[in-house]
């Protein structure tokens, strides 16, 4: 019940609620906790059209030997009218899963709250994120001028910071580009942004910071097409796909 206490921040759980949680756990947990297979909790939006790609990641992982990939939505309900049931299910399953894979395509929706949970809890060490059209921001991943322009476009599309902050962050981005050996000025970046339209998802500044944290830890996999998303999924640790599928 430690995961339940973490989910509820020490809130007292009634006897009936405890019985229901334990009954649910006895039904759902064995497949997750099976030590002979690798368990992946897959997170993402349940809204169309995003859900289809989240399900595609789960299906791709389940092609591997000895793998159980699942969504919280695949699991039965616990019937906890008083308690935040999703939090309970999230913390129990995230605790028991070997890895957590999270797909992001927008700056709104429940999956964004999950990003915060992953970044601030012990689940961080087992988590891998897949943000759509995220542009690398650290100097290790800036290889040419186009990378800098794309990262700047992403910065300018950020939804929750003022122009002064954007200007300061653009200066910092150009400094990182310079450290990576890319000769480009702030004025040149601004001009190119005005001349060329770059369509990027409008992530918030908080989310971009979380993405950057995962990027620095080598567990961020940007993608633009579903094919790229599935190819990135193959890079997750765990059992490989069958040889005949390679």
Regions found by a protein language model. Name each.
Residues 1-246:
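Conserved catalytic or regulatory cores that recognize and/or transform ribose-phosphate-containing ligands
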């Amino acid at each position: 019940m430690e995961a339940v206490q973490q989910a509820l921040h020490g809130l007292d759980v009634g006897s009936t609620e405890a019985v229901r949680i334990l009954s649910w756990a006895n039904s759902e947990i064995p497949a997750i906790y099976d030590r002979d297979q690798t368990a992946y909790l897959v997170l993402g939006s349940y809204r169309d059209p995003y859900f289809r790609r989240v399900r595609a990641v789960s299906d791709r992982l389940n092609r591997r030997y000895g793998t159980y990939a699942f969504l919280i939505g695949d699991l039965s309900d616990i019937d906890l009218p008083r308690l935040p049931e999703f939090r309970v299910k999230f913390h129990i399953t995230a605790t028991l899963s070997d890895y957590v894979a999270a797909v992001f395509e927008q700056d709104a929706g429940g999956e964004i709250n999950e990003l915060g949970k992953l970044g601030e809890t012990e689940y961080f060490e087992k988590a891998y994120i897949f943000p759509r059209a995220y542009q690398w921001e650290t100097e290790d991943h800036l290889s040419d001028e186009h990378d800098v322009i794309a990262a700047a476009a992403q910065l300018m599309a950020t939804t929750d910071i003022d122009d002064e902050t954007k200007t300061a962050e653009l200066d910092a981005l150009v400094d990182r580009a310079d450290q990576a050996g890319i000769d480009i000025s702030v004025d040149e970046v601004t001009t190119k942004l005005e001349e060329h339209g770059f369509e990027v998802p409008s992530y918030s500044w908080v989310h971009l910071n979380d993405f950057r944290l995962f990027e620095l830890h080598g567990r961020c996999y940007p993608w633009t097409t579903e094919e790229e998303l599935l190819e990135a999924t193959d890079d997750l640790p765990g059992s490989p796909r069958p040889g005949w599928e390679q």
